Amino acid sequence: MLKTLLKSVRQYKKETLLSPLCVVVEVFIEMYIPYIMGLLIDNGINKGDMDYVRKMGLFTILLALISLVLGASASYFSAHAAAGFTANLRHDMFYHIQDFSFENIDKFSSASLVTRLTTDTNNIQQAYQMSIRMAVRAPFMMIISLFMAVSISWRLTLVFLVAVPVLAFAMILIIKNARPYFPRIFRAYDELNRKVRENIRGIREVKTYVHEEEQIENFKKSTSKIYKLFRRAMFIMAFNRPVMTMMIDAVMLALSWFGAKLIVGHQLATGQLVSMFSYTMSILMSLMILSMIFTQLMMAQSSGRRVADVLTAKPTIVNPAKSPLTSVTNGEVVFDHVDFKYNKEDAHYALKDIDLRIKSGETLGIIGETGSSKSTLISMIPRLYDVTGGAVRVGGHNVRSYDLKTLRDNVAVVLQKNVLFTGTIKDNLKWGNEKASDEEIVWAAKIAQADGFIREMPDGYDTMVEQGGNNVSGGQKQRITIARALLKKPKILILDDSTSAVDTKTEREIWEALKRDLPETTKIIISQRIVSIKDADRIVVMNHGKIEDVGTHDELIKRNDLYSSIAKFQEENSK
């Protein structure tokens, strides 16, 4: 895990090294000051030598200023390194996620990926900054303080060393009991993010069905779960400070008692006892800092594993290792006894023994009841998923032989869920082809029957689209996404229920334009409405992940019970 994460340090290695270097020098100077203060008391104040007091006082101030500069430098370098490292980490994660297949996304879930990119990386940033500064400072401060304390009085050193194993045992006990809560907390954050995303995305449905109270209650449950888990973890961690305070008070009392006896017995000077107090406090404070570091590292460990899981996840769909095909000759599609299941461990097949040949330039309709795997079937063509068994061929070649960009540039898919991005309508259309000219944009929009309503908008093609396309209707959004797909000038065009929000007249105009202007493009149309596919060259009827029948509209009406029942039902409801 650590090796995976640290690859993202890259250009911030210098700052990562400079921060602990400054800390080490700072600690050496800082730990020398109590020793000087002891000399100042014993050789200056006790003897009435004010010249010595002034000289050592000025020297102490100089050391303190140097220590201040080094401390500020260490803070700057650690903050700079941690922020840069985290920026790289987020970039590496986001870049890697772009290569994920749908299977990878399904495994992690989009809500979990958002949490890992934000909350988890923030935890790692804090832990990294603490590790290259405080995690260096605390042990060095402890070691140097211990050395200085022993050099002053090994007897008094033994007094406070008794407290160290007690504190160490208490810290281990606290950490051991608190650690299991943090993975549960981050899983709860994933669930909260999922609910928030769903609510915001479906806010219109929430208001339409008056489900605000239910959504608020669900949100309360999620936040309450996080609160309870965090409260339990923090309750355990809260014992850390009282235990430390109690031990510090006990040690100081013991030092005062035994130190006073040594002074009375002329075995220790007053200044040396003052120095011992400082070194003892430094050692005990080091332990307190270490306990804080361990707390932060516990949270970061859970976050680190989650981030590393993303970075080390192998995309399930990749380019062929040797000589990928970089051109698609035609739009022929062949499903050769294709089987598919979403989970390889699952016994259930989403698709079973699909055997189908679609000729280049053919218009194929696909219909079936909800859950019959129509969308799953077409997802195999651009390799959004890979088949479990059998093969899918495009243009005479297995889709696994193609360069992914080449394949997907030649297979345009307009999915059920239409997504528009913040920007102008023209910007959204250019997702299909960044180099498209204005003439090509208008050509695609006219085929999709979008040119008319776009020109009626305040700024035409330069009209801004709000987040998620909230300022355009469902039918307008569908037509824009169809135009976007057409700009790819694909060999294969797949419309997955992409005209469900368009009126019948406009839909027919779209089909006529597609047939007229794209005669050589293979067109695959998935629809729940028979009127949308009845004029297709052939229609595939799917049922429970299998092809039940293939034929023209007239043929299927006569011989297929499922198709004829759907047609009859829709005809009766249209009257």
Stretches with model-predicted labels:
Residues 11, 15-28, 63, 130-185, ...:
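Transmembrane helices of ABC transporter permease
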Residues 49-53, 148-162, 232-306, 310-311:
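Helix-loop-helix
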Residues 21-22, 29-42, 63-110, 114, ...:
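Juxtamembrane helix-loop junctions of ABC transporter transmembrane domains
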Residues 1-33, 37, 45-59, 74-78, ...:
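Membrane-integrated ABC transporters
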Residues 326-575:
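ABC-type nucleotide-binding domain
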Residues 11-13, 99-103, 119-128, 132, ...:
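An intracellular "coupling" helix at the cytosolic face of ABC transporter transmembrane type-1 domains
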Residues 97, 219, 307, 335-337:
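Conserved catalytic Walker-motif region of ABC-type ATPase nucleotide-binding domains
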Residues 93, 97, 206, 307, ...:
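Helix-loop junctions and hydrophobic alpha-helical segments within the transmembrane domains
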